[in-house]
Amino acid sequence: SCADAYKSCDSLKCCNNRTCMCSMIGTNCTCRKK
């Protein structure tokens, strides 16, 4: 399974070969294009 947004990048697989990035450590994480 994959996701488009999450609260943490730990063990998060992003859809469409995107990279998980957080605005702050452990919060507001989103999957963005590389």
UniProtKB/Swiss-Prot annotation:
Signal peptide: none annotated. Disulfide bonds join C2-C15, C9-C20, C14-C31, C22-C29. GO terms for molecular function: ion channel inhibitor activity. Expressed by the venom gland. Keywords: Disulfide bond, Knottin, Secreted. InterPro entries: Spidertoxin. One of its GO terms (cellular component) is extracellular region. Pfam families: Toxin_9. The keyword Secreted applies. It is found in: Secreted. The keyword S-adenosyl-L-methionine does not apply. Its main location: secreted. Belongs to the neurotoxin 02 (plectoxin) family. The presence of a 'disulfide through disulfide knot' structurally defines this protein as a knottin. Non-toxic to mice and insects. This is U10-ctenitoxin-Pr1a. It comes from Phoneutria reidyi.
